[in-house]
Amino acid sequence: MKVARFQKIPNVENETMIPVLTSKRASELAVSEVAGLLQADLQNGLNKSEVSHRRAFHGWNEFDISEDEPLWKKYISQFKNPLIMLLLASAVISILMRQFDDAVSITVAIVIVVTVAFVQEYRSEKSLEELSKLVPPECHCVREGKLEHTLARDLVPGDTVCLSVGDRVPADLRLFEAVDLSVDESSLTGETAPCSKVTAPQPAANGDLASRSNIAFMGTLVRCGKAKGIVIGTGENSEFGEVFKMMQAEEAPKTPLQKSMDLLGKQLSFYSFGIIGIIMLVGWLLGKDILEMFTISVSLAVAAIPEGLPIVVTVTLALGVMRMVKKRAIVKKLPIVETLGCCNVICSDKTGTLTKNEMTVTHILTSDGLHAEVTGVGYNQFGEVIVDGDVVHGFYNPAVSRIVEAGCVCNDAVIRNNTLMGKPTEGALIALAMKMGLDGLQQDYIRKAEYPFSSEQKWMAVKCVHRTQQDRPEICFMKGAYEQVIKYCTTYNSKGQTLALTQQQRDLYQQEKARMGSAGLRVLALASGPELGQLTFLGLVGIIDPPRTGVKEAVTTLIASGVSIKMITGDSQETAIAIASRLGLYSKTSQSVSGEEVDTMEVQHLSQIVPKVAVFYRASPRHKMKIIKSLQKNGAVVAMTGDGVNDAVALKAADIGVAMGQTGTDVCKEAADMILVDDDFQTIMSAIEEGKGIYNNIKNFVRFQLSTSIAALTLISLATLMNFPNPLNAMQILWINIIMDGPPAQSLGVEPVDKDVIRKPPRNWKDSILTKNLILKILVSSIIIVCGTLFVFWRELRDNVITPRDTTMTFTCFVFFDMFNALSSRSQTKSVFEIGLCSNKMFCYAVLGSIMGQLLVIYFPPLQKVFQTESLSILDLLFLLGLTSSVCIVSEIIKKVERSREKVQKNAGSASSSFLEV
């Protein structure tokens, strides 16, 4: 069987362009051969001009998604709605019966209704498309000798890419460096066990992807270790291309709220069709024109059935999510918007979320008891190390220098141009070395082996040899949590001598560590020696990570509103409690629990004590799962933050998984429901506030739409049963439907968030959106609209002859009622004057547009013919405005009564329940 060496994309401009190597062929070749074929420099990478040249040939590293259905087809598909088809049938029947005016009127109305529905659906799709672009994949790439953080779509064949734990592989890579590398290829091969990766060429195999152990495939996840690889295939030329096309066919599931709206719509449709059928039957029995009754009934079905409700819900949720982006929170899944308002427990990591994650070493304790203070902040060389009033530099003080050496060599971070590339804790140690002029030590050693840091073991170690002394034995350097590092130490350094580590010394170091921790410092221990288990303890460094600005205020606000906050950290008990107390999380009645204690507890026992626990210290991601389960067992809705690979399972288990945008791994971001762009705890509060506001807005337009639907249905039903002439014709009913489903309704979905909403207790997730209180308000509004409209119709019918003026007055009365009803629906608790008449500009424009449209329908001759209206006097309009404002006035009175009652209850000592009382 003949195997092609590579796939080559034709290009008339340049026949010598770099090929795209297949993963099968690349796995069989040596690294040098692959680099030669791709004309790549493994160490320095490509230069910018070469990248541009290759991109022009190969394109971006992304997939060509099949083109969307043309807009005209989407528009035509709107006519497939059964109700629209029935209206078209009535228009055809009107033509056959030579009632051309009616046919034209119905057709114009259909076009308007279909256009509004099309625009709504288009907005919904576009909003959801925008959401998918909020989290672009990124990677680390070497170009022109520098490590760069760039978008994955920028990669071209021949690029050198660096991988670390938690990264998603950005393109197909031929690996040339791999340290303890393990990759999860389940998204590609279906195999759940991570695959170990190597760099050696692989013999020709049967084409099985799993056998290509020197290839990292695009879209797979790095579970362990780190590596470097050369890009051999991008976009559709990667092995993931076909898988991606299949993924595109999957439809996103509907949110619970959308499902409930669908169910509500179906229930209303069922009842509406029943009532409309009765109206047709009664009208026919009373001798009314059957075609007229059919057209009115179908029009009423279009208006009364809130088919646009799920679409408006989607648009509101999507627009709300886009607003959250401005507040630095990316919500990946729409259901989370609903869940945010129910959240009553937040489990937050300390570092980078509650604190700034700007690590700076401020204190050093050597193993022989010497204390050193460190000045300066940030990832730079500005600052000094002071011992007993003297500035130490270089190897002036061996005890301090050995600590700095260990911290510098056992380190993967790089500081370039005052910019950190790596972990903040490691950056603090490099900055310390820079202050002493010892940062070059990192390059003086050749790393032979590495034991990467993990949240489980809480230490990192490297085995090295000095470049100038490679014939000497290897030396190990270790850094990590004191409790773990001290286990590997048998001796300690004392004034240049190596002495046996006694229990007395261990107790002394433990006391110093506790003292530094109680001052809010993160404490790291450092050691070195010939091998693990025979290390010499060198000392401790204290690293400060100050609380973020505004976090304390956010914590206070959330706790007051009934949201319990738990801090989860890998730090010591002293450090954790010191920071928690400073933030207002920890009080005299609070408890703290260690990760080890969580391990020994059953979920049942943990669920009993967890309400009083404010701090979980020395905790790792595996403990988070148990904490979540214990909280959920008590009925809590839990938000959990995370940034590491091991956090992914906990984030999926939480009701709201929150990933860190800056420090979070790709695995973590993928598992999360929400991403904090700036890793700031305050952003969680802003998201909860926005989530509550969005839910309130949905309630507002549900109230508006249902009250209008019920009023329209009731009005025609009563008129038919009372043997009145029809108060509204088909075109007028369709116009009302446009107002009900159109701009005024949608503008209620973008009402600015009430600043007081964050102080309200979390909503019970089991509560229906249609509460008793909301149903009462819907019915009150519907009754007022029906009674007012029937009164106007009866008043105009006193001559017992129905005229265009009669229906125009009735029609305009209903529309004006709708506008005032929309105004009162802007808030369920506050007066329209309190929230501001013009605070929602979109609402003002929507209502103004609707009123202008109504005036055109009344006064513009061509539209008068379509809607069968006639001009009204200014006195008529003033009369209607006075009457229809009653729906808003009554609503305001109800709100006032509710607020007064709530105030009385508060004064009586009634308190909202919260999870803290569970």
UniProtKB/Swiss-Prot annotation:
GO terms for biological process: actin cytoskeleton organization; calcium ion transport; calcium-dependent cell-cell adhesion via plasma membrane cell adhesion molecules; epidermis development; Golgi calcium ion homeostasis; Golgi calcium ion transport; intracellular calcium ion homeostasis; intracellular manganese ion homeostasis. PANTHER family: CALCIUM-TRANSPORTING ATPASE. Its EC number is 7.2.2.10. The active site is at 349 (4-aspartylphosphate intermediate). This is Calcium-transporting ATPase type 2C member 1. Its main location: Golgi. Monomer. Homodimer. It is a multi-pass membrane protein. The gene is Atp2c1. Disruption phenotype: Mutant mice, born at the expected Mendelian rate, show growth retardation and exencephaly by 9.5 dpc and die by 10.5 dpc. PROSITE patterns: ATPASE_E1_E2 (PS00154). Expressed in hippocampal neurons in the CA3 region of the Amon's horn (at protein level). Expressed in brain, heart, lung, stomach, liver, colon and mammary gland. Mg(2+) binds at residues 643, 647.
